Amino acid sequence: MVAIDLGASSGRVMLASYYPGQQQLTLREVCRFTNQIKSIDGSDVWDIDAIEQSIREGLSQLDSEGIALDSIGIDSWGVDFVLLDKQGKRIGQPVSYRDSRTQGVMARAQQTLGSNAIYRRTGIQFLPFNTLYQLRALSEQQPHLLADVAHLLLIPDYLHYRLTGQLNWEYTNASTTQLLNIETGDWDSDLLAYAGVPAHWFAKPGKPGNTIGYWHSANGQQVPVVAVATHDTASAVLAAPLIDADAAYLSSGTWSLMGFESGTPLTHQQAQCSNITNEGGAEGRYRVLKNIMGLWLLQRATDELQIDDLPQLIEQAARQPACRSLINPNDSRFINPPNMCREIQNACREHQFPVPNTAAQLARCIFDSLAMLYRQVAQELATLRGRPISHLHIVGGGCQNQFLNQLCADACGLNVSMGPVEASTLGNIGSQLISLGEVADVTHYRRIVANNFPLHHLSPHDNSDFAAHWLQFQSLSQLPKELCI
């Protein structure tokens, strides 16, 4: 089986082999490639052709090796999309969610439709780049494009289409758009109308697990292409070895997503005021979670400072005074500033914290601030569920940053387990194995993952200065009142 896992900064083609007798699961990285935002005609866009080419090269390599493939699946980040014309050809490049075209659009939607009405319909966190606001911006700013559009496909659906020629709309990723009605599981006609787009661009989203079509290889293979849980976080959660019903997960990468699984969505006012999202998951579950800006801040800062030795930077950051400077990582100013280091420094200056000037000080500011935000979100989630979190499972690339994860354990006061690193890839494979009938269900698959990919564990440390630091952070991170209206 092949899992193609696309993140906001890189992509990978991974080969998985499963031996049912021993319930052994192995992964092999076929290729890894960078995925970066490009500026074209004043817009920040994804180079979707380069992504597709890298995927095809990985698949062709496996085909040339004579490896018989059972299935293929693709997962990616959410909310971004590709427009197709009536001939099935792409219209322009897909614009990145970090593009500035949506500035002010969400606030106008909240005023016009009411935050309460939008949230009750969708159960989705208010983020300025949700597809709802991207489409409203498109219809306001480039209405001439709309007449040529026949279909809108989210990123993994588009790439599945390119491999098979078949259109598909997968549910877990569709749920991130803030266009899906949480009661019906279908596109909300009133929100589509507000976005300025017709319903015939879409079909009702399907649950993960169906075969979309087939990829025909140069050597004659006809490989089923499976609609996995195509949102990368949905796949990551599918592979998270949650130990009990009170455990929570933190999918840690470019974004950090903290939450828990629920059989029902939480769309009451307390969830809305906490800006909690209810995204679709496997087996009809909901991923009740919150998006946190995550390691994007560090990625941008290290790029600007031209730092390649990340372990050394983390070691230097660990020697800096704790919580000397704090920011709110979820402040919209950090979505895509011209200069991240300068933006962090300005935020510290404005809130009368010492300005971090060295790379180590900047990194420590980011790590401390993320840990504080993890604590805040963990408390919000526990309050919403009505019982404390028993354990936190950190999955994804951020598993490898043990210093940040120890800060998280300390701030949250929770025992933490770390792993698997390739959680999105493994969740992608899990959807394929369940679809193929090789694995019974998600619970069974999580046992397989836990047995094949050992976890690492951390316990919280006491910190006598923590209470004062926590009060300082709380003053930075109050949610806007308009979310509750």
Swiss-Prot record:
Cofactor list: Mg(2+)
Active-site residues per Swiss-Prot or TrEMBL entry: D232 (proton acceptor)
Pfam family, one: FGGY_N
Disulfide bridge map: C348-C365, C408-C412
Pathway given in the UniProt record: Carbohydrate degradation; L-rhamnose degradation; glycerone phosphate from L-rhamnose: step 2/3
GO biological process entries: glycerol metabolic process; rhamnose catabolic process
Keywords: ATP-binding, Disulfide bond, Kinase, Magnesium, Nucleotide-binding, Rhamnose metabolism, Transferase
Top-level taxon of the source organism: Bacteria
Binding, substrate: G78, H231, D232, T233, N291
Record flagged with keyword Nucleotide-binding: yes
UniProt: ATP binding residues: A8, S9, S10, G11, R12, T254, Q299, G397
Catalytic activity: L-rhamnulose + ATP = L-rhamnulose 1-phosphate + ADP + H(+)
Broad class of enzyme this protein falls into: transferase
Enzyme Commission (EC) number: 2.7.1.5
Any one Gene Ontology molecular-function term assigned to this protein's record: glycerol kinase activity
GO cellular component, one term: cytosol
Protein role: Involved in the catabolism of L-rhamnose (6-deoxy-L-mannose). Catalyzes the transfer of the gamma-phosphate group from ATP to the 1-hydroxyl group of L-rhamnulose to yield L-rhamnulose 1-phosphate.
The family this protein is said to belong to: Belongs to the rhamnulokinase family.
Protein name, entry field: Rhamnulokinase
Origin species: Yersinia pestis (strain Pestoides F)
Name of the gene: rhaB
